[in-house]
Amino acid sequence: MLESHNDTAVAIAEHLGGSVSGFAAKMNQKAKLLGMSSTHFITPNGLDANGHYSTASDMCKLASYAIKNKDFLSLVQTKSHSFSDCSGKYHYSLTNHDAFLSYYEGALGIKTGFTGKAGYCFVGAAKKNGITLTSCVLASGWPPNKSFKWSDTKSLMDYGFFYFQKTPLPVQNLALAKIPVKDGKKKFVSLKPIIPKETLTASFDSLKIVYRIPTALCAPIRKNTPIGSISFYINNKLFQKTEVFPSESIEKSCFSDTIEQVLNQWMDIFCLS
């Protein structure tokens, strides 16, 4: 990682995937899980190849996922590392080529890249005031303009930290809702409360929340089975969907339950009279 050693990436790919193509298949499977819909990997080191492509947006998704791993985050923040071979006879020193670590306050990394077709590239991350942002610049100049990627990334980060802030999602208190239950041992069921989360928004963003919750349910009801959802849209684009669950399970009523309900109703009438 520190020296961008392409041969090592191939060796790791062959060890973990059995072959480069086998490892690429694992990479593509993971990319799909992360929502990287415009990415297809062929090489493990990012070198140019037919059918090997991605986008800045997808690289940011990958970066956001990767920096949640403490070992990975520690690695990309390492500026240099020295080690010896197994015999202790030979010593080696590695230097991180990520100048962004020293160039930008709050920088976390992450990785540089260059090919003749892609130009200078950089996936970056930075943290300020409890907010972590990721960025990606592709084709940010060609030789001799090696430093363009640093200034371009700085501009992106400055923009992000200036305009975006943490915003709590205004979710209604679902615990107050009572959903009628047909043919159940109970007539109503409440909903599990949803803890409001935060997201990054700018003052010019529009937030829309769509509740899809039924007006009535039929027994049986299982508390671990979702009965609705809440969708959150920023600028009319879905960015998060949360499932809604009942607070308890309710079994379907039987004949004896019906008789008991009728008797209770008669007792209530008798007491009132």
Predicted regions, residues:
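Mid-domain, small-residue-enriched loop/turn segments at the edges of structured enzyme/sensor domains
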Residues: 13-67
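Mid-bilayer segments of alpha-helical transmembrane spans in multi-pass integral membrane proteins
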Residues: 7-8
